[in-house]
């Protein structure tokens, strides 16, 4: 179940707000410029699907986003618990960073935790299958896929080169709850 938990930048143990209601989550995030929507991820992808299979199954969703925002490229990130690079990838994504473009993800399997550092608050968004999130360009954030990752998401980019991060050097991510 998707969830949003909001923390103060200075108080990492007691949430200011929490909800698992998709409409409430969307309202809170939209007020901060973050797009959050529930889409249908209803295609049977089989076990450990190839990127091409995922793209073909959800080309209609990609086309919708491209038509809306003029995105130039897309790919698929799919990680499972048996991935030999899971620890290195988790460590990389857990560092607070920004992008020069929106970070758009459509989760078609599994879950991951986007943590957005907006002003003096941290918004932890548990994204699951059927969730579309678009983090605005320049928003400091990090992503936690957990110690045993299990997700597939379509990534949509303005930049044809794909995922390019500018790391902030802030260790704030270390202070907040993570996925197990």
Curated annotation (Swiss-Prot):
Site (Important to generate the dianion) location in chain: 105
Binding site for Ni(2+): 97, 99, 103, 141
Keyword field: Amino-acid biosynthesis, Dioxygenase, Iron, Metal-binding, Methionine biosynthesis, Nickel, Oxidoreductase
EC numbers: 1.13.11.54, 1.13.11.53
Enzyme class: oxidoreductase
Pathway entry: Amino-acid biosynthesis; L-methionine biosynthesis via salvage pathway; L-methionine from S-methyl-5-thio-alpha-D-ribose 1-phosphate: step 5/6
UniProt-recorded Gene Ontology molecular function terms: acireductone dioxygenase (Ni2+-requiring) activity; acireductone dioxygenase [iron(II)-requiring] activity; iron ion binding; nickel cation binding
The UniProt record lists the keyword Iron: yes
Chain positions of site May play a role in transmitting local conformational changes: 102
Residue(s) at site: May play a role in metal incorporation in vivo: 96
Cofactor binding, note field: Binds 1 Fe(2+) cation per monomer. Binds 1 nickel ion per monomer.
Known cofactor(s): Fe(2+); Ni(2+)
Reactions accelerated catalytically: 1,2-dihydroxy-5-(methylsulfanyl)pent-1-en-3-one + O2 = 3-(methylsulfanyl)propanoate + CO + formate + 2 H(+); 1,2-dihydroxy-5-(methylsulfanyl)pent-1-en-3-one + O2 = 4-methylsulfanyl-2-oxobutanoate + formate + 2 H(+)
Pfam families: ARD (PF03079)
InterPro entries: ARD, ARD_bac, RmlC-like_jellyroll, RmlC_Cupin_sf
GO biological process, one term: L-methionine salvage from methylthioadenosine
Record flagged with keyword Metal-binding: yes
HAMAP family for the chain: Salvage_MtnD (MF_01682)
Family note: Belongs to the acireductone dioxygenase (ARD) family.
Subunit structure: Monomer.
Cited function: Catalyzes 2 different reactions between oxygen and the acireductone 1,2-dihydroxy-3-keto-5-methylthiopentene (DHK-MTPene) depending upon the metal bound in the active site. Fe-containing acireductone dioxygenase (Fe-ARD) produces formate and 2-keto-4-methylthiobutyrate (KMTB), the alpha-ketoacid precursor of methionine in the methionine recycle pathway. Ni-containing acireductone dioxygenase (Ni-ARD) produces methylthiopropionate, carbon monoxide and formate, and does not lie on the methionine recycle pathway.
The protein's name: Acireductone dioxygenase
Gene: mtnD
